[in-house]
Structures are given as C-alpha cells and as structure tokens.
Amino acid sequence: GGAEYALMTLLLDHHCLKFERQDLLEQDIIRTRSALQFQKKHLDRAMDRKVHIYRILDSRREHFKLGIPYQKRVSKIEALYTRPEIEILYIINEGKYETFKKGNTRPHEYVRRQLANMPKGNIKSKDYVTAYWEPQLERLIETIREYARMTPDPFEQTLAAILK
C-alpha cells in the first residue's frame, strides 16, 4: 500500500537498508501485487542476474506464485510482514502498544480514535507517512526493530531484517 511504499522509500533514500536504489529492478520500489502481472511486466526481458524479491505484506493470505519459466529468473522470494497493519508502528512510537494490546481495536481505528495528539490526516497516505517519519528517521528504525521483537513473526519476516 501507500504507507508501506512511503516507509520503504524513506528507508531506501536515506541508505538505511541492506541494499541501495541502484540494486533494485528498475531502480525503484515496485508495487505490483500479482505474480502474473509482475512476471509479464518485469521478468519478460533478458536479465544478467537473478532477482531477489522482497514483498511487504500485512497478511499471510496473499499468494505470489510465478510461472515455471519465470522461476529460474528469481533467486528468492521473501515476505516481510507488517502485521496486523503498518499503523502498529505509530502505536509503538507513541508508547501506546501495551494499551492497544489490551483492547480489541484494529490498529488504524486505534490510531484514529486514541492517538489524538498525532497530526490529523490520512495516516496511510504517502505524504502523511513521509511528514511523520522523515523528521524522526532514527526513531522509525528503532520502532521497526522494536516491532520485530514484539511480533510473533520470525525476525527474518519483519522489516527489521532488511535494515542495515
């Protein structure tokens, strides 16, 4: 989604990831969810090396199965989860994770209702995410690492796994 794209762009542009923009296919973050569309759009041309795919997801239900002819062009496909939702990073950053856990509210609803001190706006928009996190980039990195410690997902399936 837009929030994930904005976060990844921030981390990439500030050299916080294990890879740089020039390492990326087309030197950009690709927002294609469908394996069929991805292979047609990005793997249909001759390439001098295999591609490593990172997928940023908030659900384990999404499947990404490349066709057999395209599988040989990919070295690995890794899913990185921001479950239950990317808004969990706001909740952790604002020091409200324990309170959030006690309730029964989705993260985006919790942020909207309980974090009144946060700037108003669409918390999932690229502009909002950039305006909120860019001035506190070190805090974003700390929050991603903190989330990796809290989540039941294995470390290698969190955004922290691709941080420098």
Protein language model features and the residues they cover:
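C-terminal accessory helical subdomains adjacent to catalytic cores in phosphodiester-
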Residues: 5-25, 38-164
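N-terminal beta-loop-helix "entrance" segment that forms/cooperates
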Residues: 30-40
